């Protein structure tokens, strides 16, 4: 079985290692970086900076723990070194794993030339590859509207921010979704004056209003300015005697914002425009995404798509799971007992302060379809470990079926929410009941005790 994978991110890498272990002859073609550009150039650097910013934020609160007040400052060179060190370690470990499985790695730009062939433009020339099955997992890139022209210096896409060439004294973030609020948290933690342009009446418009309210409260406490009900229509760089080199963001309601930097965080677009998918007969939708079925198969039965290009949840965890499912399908394991990937049960997290995480059925979704649910909510202020940590913000909310007690979903806002949500995610995936959580003997004192309290 000749299996060619275009794109070496989480989906491609996972598909490659699983398929190679099952006996396939696997080749990965990667244009940018083994490990994935969105993963190693976006996700990992942003979370590294958020962790550093979180450490600074925590240091400012230690006076509440019987310690002297601390006021740490950013060591930009040290931060850059830390980011590059983590990226290098992850890239090397991924490359080593793939090579140990016998996966062939080709650095170059792939383009399909037919239903079973593609060419790769490398530094040495053009190489032709034939395949029995192929996976398109080329990821995505930041979306840039036609009214904005990022320069990588003052007007930034998310990929320009790790860290920016000049550290911002003030920054305006355009976009109040997951990525946007993470940048607000990150730059405000570093001491920048932050403005967030919010097109709706709450941040995180797709999330539970109670969740958004906790985050907004934290933003306002940090001095973040929220421009609600405004859509940015232009971002221009200018220089004057009063403000020096800065940017001006204009909104559709006439409001303007001046800041040293602006960050576009308005989503991403798939990397499919130059792959030659039409030559392979692969259909692409109006947004550039590749439609797939439950096995990640495109309209061509031997060509798969996974990760951001598939138009499903843009999460590394989802991409990696898709990659494993693709490998199993390529090698025929789907004919055995097989669990399809259920995107509705994927856990997700937002690395703000406090952290936000959710999984499964949301309260608003249940109400929209008239489904009866049981909602229980416990604040972390009732949990001893939260008080010990000097951080009692947030809550745990569990949604269950009132008739059966089966856990349907949940939300957590608070410290380590991204870790704690795994308990609810496991319950949702395994169809456990709230009584299963209640009967679990957990550690005391621990934040996880709030899960038991909420389940009761």
Map each language-model feature to its residues.
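Extreme N-terminal starter segment of soluble prokaryotic enzymes
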Residues: 1-3
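Flexible, glycine-rich terminal cap/loop adjacent to redox cofactors
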Residues: 6-32, 37, 44, 48-55, ...
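Catalytic nucleophile loop
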Residues: 12, 177-180, 319
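Glycine-rich flavin
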Residues: 17-24, 29-167, 200-204, 209-211, ...
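Glycine-rich dinucleotide-binding loop and its adjacent helix/turn
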Residues: 43, 138-197, 278-280, 284-295, ...
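A Rossmann-like FAD-binding core segment of flavoenzymes
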Residues: 70, 104-107, 111-122, 129, ...
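FAD-site-proximal beta/loop scaffold in flavoenzymes
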Residues: 152-167, 256-335
């Amino acid at each position: 079985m000749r299996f060619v994978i275009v794109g070496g991110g989480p989906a491609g890498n996972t598909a490659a290692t699983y398929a190679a272990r099952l006996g396939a002859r696997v080749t990965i073609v990667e244009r940018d970086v083994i490990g994935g550009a969105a993963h190693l150039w976006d996700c990992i650097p942003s979370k590294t900076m958020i962790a550093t910013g979180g450490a600074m934020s925590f240091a400012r609160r230690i006076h509440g723990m019987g310690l002297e007040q601390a006021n740490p400052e950013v060591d930009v060179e040290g931060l850059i070194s830390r980011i590059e060190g983590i990226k290098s370690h992850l890239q090397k470990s991924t490359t080593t794993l793939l090579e140990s499985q016998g996966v062939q790695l080709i650095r170059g730009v792939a383009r399909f030339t037919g239903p079973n062939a593609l060419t790769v433009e490398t530094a040495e020339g053009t190489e032709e590859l034939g395949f029995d099955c192929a996976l398109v997992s080329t990821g995505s890139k930041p979306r840039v509207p036609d009214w904005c022209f990022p320069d990588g210096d003052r007007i930034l896409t998310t990929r320009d921010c790790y860290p920016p060439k000049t550290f911002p004294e003030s920054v305006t973030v355009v976009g109040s979704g997951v990525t946007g609020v993470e940048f607000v948290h990150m730059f405000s933690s570093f001491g920048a004056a932050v403005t967030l342009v919010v097109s709706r009446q709450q941040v995180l418009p797709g999330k539970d209003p109670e969740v958004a309210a906790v985050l907004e409260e934290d933003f306002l406490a940090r001095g973040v300015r929220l421009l609600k009900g405004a859509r940015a229509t232009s971002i221009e760089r200018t220089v004057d005697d009063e403000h020096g080199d800065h940017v001006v963001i204009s909104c559709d309601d006439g409001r303007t914002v001046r800041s040293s930097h602006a960050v576009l965080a308005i989503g991403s677009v798939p990397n499919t425009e130059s792959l030659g998918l039409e030559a392979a007969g692969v259909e692409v939708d109006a947004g550039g995404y590749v439609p797939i079925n439950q096995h990640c198969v495109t309209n061509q039965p031997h060509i798969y798509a996974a990760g951001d290009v598939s138009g499903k949840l843009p999460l590394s965890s989802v991409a990696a799971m898709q990659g494993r499912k693709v490998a199993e399908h390529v090698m025929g394991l789907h004919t055995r007992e097989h669990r399809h990937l259920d995107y509705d049960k994927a856990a997700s997290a937002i690395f703000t302060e406090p952290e936000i995480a959710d999984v499964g059925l949301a309260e608003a979704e249940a109400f929209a379809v008239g489904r009866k649910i049981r909602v229980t909510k416990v604040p972390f202020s009732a949990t001893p470990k939260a008080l010990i940590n000097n951080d009692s913000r947030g809550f745990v909310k569990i949604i269950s079926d009132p008739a059966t007690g089966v856990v349907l979903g949940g939300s957590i806002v608070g410290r380590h929410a991204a870790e704690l949500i795994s308990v609810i995610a496991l319950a949702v995936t395994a169809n456990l009941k709230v009584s299963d959580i209640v009967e679990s003997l957990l550690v005391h004192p621990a934040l996880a005790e709030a899960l038991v309290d909420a389940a009761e």
